[in-house]
A protein has these predicted regions:
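Short amphipathic alpha-helices and their capping loops
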Residues: 1-23, 79-89, 151
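Gly/Ser/Thr-rich phosphate-binding loops and adjoining beta-strand/alpha-helix segments
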Residues: 3-6, 21-51, 66-82, 136-138, ...
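Acyl-group handling in specialized metabolite and lipid biosynthesis
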Residues: 28-44, 93-107, 188
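Acyl activation and transfer enzymes in specialized metabolism, enriched
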Residues: 39-64, 177-196
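Small-residue-rich loop/turn and linker elements
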Residues: 66-99, 125-134, 218
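Helical lid/core segments from catalytic subdomains that handle acyl or acyl-like groups
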Residues: 90-146
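Histidine-centered acyl-transfer/condensation active-site motif
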Residues: 130-143, 161-200
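Flexible helix-coil linker/hinge segments at domain or subdomain boundaries
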Residues: 203-216
Length: 218
């Protein structure tokens, strides 16, 4: 994946970058209840997980700071596009990882996601090839409506954002689910986390609009 090197000494966040880089646990994590009522009404038979994943990936890519990664030499790379590496459950209850590369339209994304999931389930091993540094690491816990999630991080230089979501519930006519975003605080702040959730709302609204205008179910 193509990336641009960011000169953090000239970046507006140069002070914050240096400050959080020195920490043993430089990560920030937020969980927000996201309203998916309109999406669920318009979804029809379209796959829920891949539909939400599509919106999440587009929202995360819309925030440049979430596409930034720490390189082994200490420099910061900003990728043009970051793909998801996400969990897929096998029949035995053990998960493997799948990826969907490229900035694809919705139907292409779903088709590629279904193809990749079939491949990784047949292969059965945990990991797959790809540029791990560029990925968003995504997982879901569809059995649990939680209030917060904490992700394992390999070391203080682990800069791949983690995105998780839990079980959706309906109350008072609205359907919501918890969505968690974990970032490296040297690369992103609360402003950028907030922008992700704003973009996610916009992407879900746009996807819902497209579905409502479409004359075909999936």
């Amino acid at each position: 994946m193509h990336y641009t090197i960011i000169d953090m000494e000239k970046d507006p966040r140069c002070g914050q970058f240096a400050y959080f880089r020195a920490m043993q646990y430089p990560f920030a994590s937020v969980t927000v209840e996201v309203d998916i009522t309109d999406m669920m009404t318009a979804r029809g038979s379209r796959p829920f997980f891949l539909s939400l994943l599509y919106a999440v990936v587009r929202a995360a890519n819309a925030v440049p700071q979430l596409r930034r990664r720490l390189l082994p030499d200490g420099r910061v790379a900003e990728y043009d596009w970051c793909a998801p590496s996400y969990t897929v459950m096998k029949p035995d209850g053990v998960y493997v990882y799948a990826t969907v590369e490229g900035n694809l339209a919705y139907e292409e994304f779903v088709a590629e996601g279904q193809r990749r999931q079939k491949e990784v389930l047949e292969r059965g091993t945990l990991t797959e090839d790809g540029n791990l540094r560029s990925f968003f690491f995504v997982s879901s816990v569809p059995w649990l409506h939680y209030t917060h999630a904490q992700n394992p991080m390999e070391n203080p230089n682990d800069s791949n954002p983690r995105i998780n979501w839990g079980k959706y519930v309906t109350a008072n006519g609205r359907t919501t689910l918890p969505v968690t975003l974990t970032v490296h605080h040297a690369l992103a702040d609360g402003l950028h986390i907030s922008r992700f959730y704003q973009k996610l709302e916009e992407e879900l609204a746009e996807l819902t609009r497209q579905w409502n205008e479409s004359k075909k179910d999936f």
